[in-house]
C-alpha cells in the first residue's frame, strides 16, 4: 500500500453527536498559527498561564491544543506514541495534568494516514500517523487525559467516501475509550477540498470547511491556500444547515491579534466566527497580546451569541454582493443579526425585525460591540465601515422561526429525477443534469439564504444570461449571478436574470441538461426538496 493511501470502505457506525462533547462550539487556543513546529513544554505552559491570567479561561476558552510536531519521531517498542523528550521532557500526561490543574482542557494533534503534515512536507522527521494504530492511539490519548483531538488528513490520496470511512475509524476508537473527547477533523489538508462537500456531523464534532486560513482579509482564493477571512466566510455561509449541537462547521483557527489586518477587520473576523457558530479557537501569541486583541477575544456579548444552546449557525437573510445580512436564532427567542460590509467603503446596511424572524411592533436592540441598547419598531440599520460588521441582539416581540437552511435533493416535478452534478465533476462550468435519485453527494444541495451549493460549489448563472443559457456550478464568490429565489410555485429563479431553472426541452430522461429559461411554472421548472 502506498504511503498515505486509505482502504477499507465501510459506512459510518456511531454518530459523533452521541459522544456528549461540543454541545456548543468549542472555545480554546491552538499553537499552530503563531508557532508552527516551534513548540515545547514551556511554551504551552506559559500560554496556558496567560489564558488564565488574561481572563480568557473565564470567558470560555478552555481547550489548549498542541498542534503538529509534539511527538517523538519514533513510536516505542510496543508501537505507542511518545512525546518528544527534548520538547516535552515531562511527558504528555504531565502536560495534561498541568492544564487540568489550571481549569483547562488538553488537546492534541494527529493524522489518519502515515505522516503528519509536517512530516509529509519534510519539516519534521518520522512517520507517526495513526494509520493502523487507531485503537491503540485512542487509548493512549485517553490515558494521557486528552479532551480534544485535531485529526488532519495530510494526504492527497483518498476519495471522499474513503475519507468518511477513515475518519470514522478514529471516531469509533475514541468512543470505545469511554472518555468524552471533542473530535475535530480537517479533510482538506493536502487534498481536494471535500470539507464543504458533505455534512460531516455523522463523523465528527467539527470539520474544516476550507483550506488553511492566513492573517489577511482577502487573498483572492475561492478554496485554495491561503484563505483570507472574507474568502472563508463566502464558503461557510451557505453551509448553515449543517450546524447543530455537537456538530459545527469549522472555518479554521482565528487570526485575531496576529497582524495583517486592520482593527475593524479583526473585529469582523471575530464577530462573523461568533454568529456562524464556529469554534472559537484563538491562534495568537496569548502571552503578549494587546489590550485591543484581548478585548475582541473576550467580548461577552458575541461569546454568548456563539455559545447559545440552540447551536444554530446564522443563516443569510440578504446579500447584494457587498452588504450581507445574517440572522441567528437564539434559545430565549432573541435573534442575533449581523450586518456585514464586504465592500471597500462605508455603507448603510438595513433589514427588518420581520425579515430576521421576529413578530411584533416594538423591539430592543443590544449592540454587541458597545453594549448600548436602543428601541425600534422594526427597522434594523447601521452605518458600517469597509470590512466591518455590526451585530445586534434583537429582543422583544414574538419569534417566527424563518425557514431553516435546508440540505437535500432537488427533485424535478416533471420526471421525479434529481438535480445532479454529473460524475461529481467539480470543474467550474460543469452543467447539472437530471438523473435517477440515488442519495449521492453530487445530488445533495445545501440551500441557505439565496445560494444553492453542492460539492462545495455554487449553482451559478452565466453573466448576462439569456433564455437557453446553461446553468452551471462555479466557485462560490458571492456574485449576484449565484443568488436564487425559491418560489411558492416550486420554481427556482435566478435573481440577476429573472430566468428560471429549467429541464431542457421538458425532457425527462437521465442526463437531460438543466438550463435557464423564461419562467412559466411548467412541470419542468418546478422542484421539490427531499
Language-model regions: role of each:
Residues 1-15:
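Secretory targeting and sorting signals
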Residues 4, 399-530:
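Lectin-like carbohydrate-binding module/patch detector with strong preference for beta-trefoil
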Residues 14-45, 50-53, 181, 185, ...:
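N-terminal module-boundary/linker segments of secreted carbohydrate-active enzymes
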Residues 25-31, 60-67, 105-110, 142, ...:
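Structural recognition of the beta-strand scaffold that forms the well-ordered cores
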Residues 47, 51-160:
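Aromatic-lined carbohydrate-binding/catalytic grooves of carbohydrate-active enzymes
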Residues 133-136, 182-285:
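Glycan-recognition surfaces
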Residues 273-276, 281-283, 319-358:
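Carbohydrate-binding surface patches
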Residues 376-399:
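C-terminal beta-strand-rich structural cap/linker in extracellular carbohydrate-active enzymes
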Amino acid at each position: 500500500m502506498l504511503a498515505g493511501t486509505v482502504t477499507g470502505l465501510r459506512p459510518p457506525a456511531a454518530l459523533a453527536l452521541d459522544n456528549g462533547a461540543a454541545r456548543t462550539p468549542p472555545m480554546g487556543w491552538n499553537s499552530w498559527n503563531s508557532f508552527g513546529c516551534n513548540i515545547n513544554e514551556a511554551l504551552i505552559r506559559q500560554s496556558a498561564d496567560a489564558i488564565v491570567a488574561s481572563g480568557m479561561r473565564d470567558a470560555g476558552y478552555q481547550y489548549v491544543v498542541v498542534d503538529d510536531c509534539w511527538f517523538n519521531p519514533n513510536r516505542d517498542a510496543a508501537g505507542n506514541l511518545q512525546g518528544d523528550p527534548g520538547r516535552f521532557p515531562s511527558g504528555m500526561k504531565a502536560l495534561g495534568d498541568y492544564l487540568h490543574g489550571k481549569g483547562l482542557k488538553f488537546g492534541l494533534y494527529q493524522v489518519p494516514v502515515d505522516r503528519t503534515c509536517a512530516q509529509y512536507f519534510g519539516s519534521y522527521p518520522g512517520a507517526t500517523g495513526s494509520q493502523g494504530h487507531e485503537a491503540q492511539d485512542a487509548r493512549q490519548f485517553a490515558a494521557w487525559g486528552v479532551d480534544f483531538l485535531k485529526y488532519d488528513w495530510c494526504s492527497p490520496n483518498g476519495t471522499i467516501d474513503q475519507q468518511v470511512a477513515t475518519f470514522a475509524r478514529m471516531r469509533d476508537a475514541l468512543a470505545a475509550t469511554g472518555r468524552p473527547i471533542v473530535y475535530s477533523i480537517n479533510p482538506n489538508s493536502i487534498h481536494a477540498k471535500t470539507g464543504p462537500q458533505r455534512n460531516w456531523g455523522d463523523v465528527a464534532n467539527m470539520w474544516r470547511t476550507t483550506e488553511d486560513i492566513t492573517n489577511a482579509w482577502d487573498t483572492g482564493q475561492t478554496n485554495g491556500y491561503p484563505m483570507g477571512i472574507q474568502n472563508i466566510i463566502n464558503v461557510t455561509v451557505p453551509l448553515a444547515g449543517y450546524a447543530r449541537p455537537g456538530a459545527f462547521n469549522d472555518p479554521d483557527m482565528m487570526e485575531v491579534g496576529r497582524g495583517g489586518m486592520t482593527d475593524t477587520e479583526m473585529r469582523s473576523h471575530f464577530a462573523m466566527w461568533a454568529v456562524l457558530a464556529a469554534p472559537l479557537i484563538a491562534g495568537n501569541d496569548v502571552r503578549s497580546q494587546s489590550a485591543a486583541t484581548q478585548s475582541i477575544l473576550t467580548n461577552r456579548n458575541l461569546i454568548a451569541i456563539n455559545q447559545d444552546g440552540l447551536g444554530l449557525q446564522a443563516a443569510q437573510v440578504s446579500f447584494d454582493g457587498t452588504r450581507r445580512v445574517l440572522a441567528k436564532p437564539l434559545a430565549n427567542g432573541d435573534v442575533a443579526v449581523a450586518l456585514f460590509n464586504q465592500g471597500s467603503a462605508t455603507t448603510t446596511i438595513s433589514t427588518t425585525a420581520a425579515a430576521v424572524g421576529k413578530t411584533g411592533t416594538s423591539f430592543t436592540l443590544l449592540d454587541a460591540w458597545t453594549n448600548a441598547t436602543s428601541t425600534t419598531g422594526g427597522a434594523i440599520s447601521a452605518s458600517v465601515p469597509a470590512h466591518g460588521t455590526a451585530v445586534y441582539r434583537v429582543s422583544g416581540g414574538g419569534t417566527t422561526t424563518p425557514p431553516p437552511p435546508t440540505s437535500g435533493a432537488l427533485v424535478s416535478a416533471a420526471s421525479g429525477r434529481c438535480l445532479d452534478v454529473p460524475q461529481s465533476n467539480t470543474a467550474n462550468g460543469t452543467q447539472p443534469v437530471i438523473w435517477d435519485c440515488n442519495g449521492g453527494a453530487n445530488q445533495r444541495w445545501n440551500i441557505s439564504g439565496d445560494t444553492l451549493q453542492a460539492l462545495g460549489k455554487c449553482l451559478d448563472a452565466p453573466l448576462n444570461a439569456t433564455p437557453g443559457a446553461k446553468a452551471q456550478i462555479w466557485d462560490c464568490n458571492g456574485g449576484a449571478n449565484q443568488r436564487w429565489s425559491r418560489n411558492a410555485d416550486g420554481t427556482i429563479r435566478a435573481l440577476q436574470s429573472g430566468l428560471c431553472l429549467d429541464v431542457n426541452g421538458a425532457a425527462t430522461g437521465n442526463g437531460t441538461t438543466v438550463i435557464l429559461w423564461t419562467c412559466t411554472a411548467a412541470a419542468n421548472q418546478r422542484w421539490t426538496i427531499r
